[in-house]
């Protein structure tokens, strides 16, 4: 990361601290990640603003605050293996891969997946497994997972995902249509405890449609 980007990423991490993010490893990962590499060059000047930005195909790179917030919630269960639904630009995966030993990520849009793989390889992040497929179904053959993060809003919590959690595992997912709620769902045996975190806005999680 060049000096200007490094300074900008550090300033972004500081602004997230001021916004309420307190997990030091998360803030360090944000400070170490060049967000402009996950955007088209035309949007590079906005890379370190705390806002969501378009990445093509009707998708977005999430607001840095939400990336950090979802990550610190997920890390509360100290996961060893994590599944991400919605690779998108790869930015969220870049943050997670610095914080967990093993990351699996699923993307339904082939062009986005190819770009994300290239970006993450250039950042020397090699603890990531990629799948082109339907995020609603997760990635059963790689499971179970200690934690699952969904980066698009589902109309309801997908049973296929909760079933891929370990006992004590956590699903972090935005749920809803016009009004969306970020949920933390914890598996306790064959039961699931849901906790509402905050109001959010995400692109929809598409069921069964690849692009």
From Swiss-Prot:
It is found in: Cytoplasm. Catalyzes the methyl esterification of L-isoaspartyl residues in peptides and proteins that result from spontaneous decomposition of normal L-aspartyl and L-asparaginyl residues. It plays a role in the repair and/or degradation of damaged proteins. The gene is pcm. GO terms for biological process: methylation; protein modification process; protein repair. HAMAP family: PIMT. NCBIfam families: pimt, PRK00312.1. This is Protein-L-isoaspartate O-methyltransferase. It comes from Shewanella piezotolerans (strain WP3 / JCM 13877). It catalyses: [protein]-L-isoaspartate + S-adenosyl-L-methionine = [protein]-L-isoaspartate alpha-methyl ester + S-adenosyl-L-homocysteine. It comes from the Bacteria. One of its GO terms (cellular component) is cytoplasm.
């Amino acid at each position: 990361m060049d000096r200007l980007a490094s300074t900008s990423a550090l300033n972004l991490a500081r602004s997230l601290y001021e916004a309420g993010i307190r997990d030091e490893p998360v803030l360090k990962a944000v400070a170490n990640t060049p967000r402009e590499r996950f955007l088209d060059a035309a949007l590079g000047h906005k890379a370190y603003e705390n806002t969501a930005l378009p990445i093509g195909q009707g998708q977005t790179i999430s607001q840095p605050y939400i990336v950090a917030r979802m990550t610190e919630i997920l890390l509360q269960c100290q996961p060893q293996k994590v599944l991400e639904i919605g690779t998108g630009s790869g930015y969220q995966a870049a943050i997670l891969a610095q914080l967990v030993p093993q990351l699996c990520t699923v993307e339904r849009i082939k062009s986005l997946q190819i770009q994300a793989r290239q970006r993450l390889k250039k950042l020397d992040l090699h603890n990531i497994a990629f799948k082109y497929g339907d995020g609603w179904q997760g990635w059963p053959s790689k499971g179970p997972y200690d934690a699952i993060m969904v980066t698009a809003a589902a109309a309801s919590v997908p049973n296929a995902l909760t079933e891929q959690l370990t006992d004590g595992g956590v699903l972090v997912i935005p749920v809803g249509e016009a009004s969306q709620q970020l949920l933390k769902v914890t598996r306790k045996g064959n039961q699931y405890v849901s906790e509402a975190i905050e109001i959010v806005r995400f692109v929809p999680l598409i069921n069964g449609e690849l692009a």
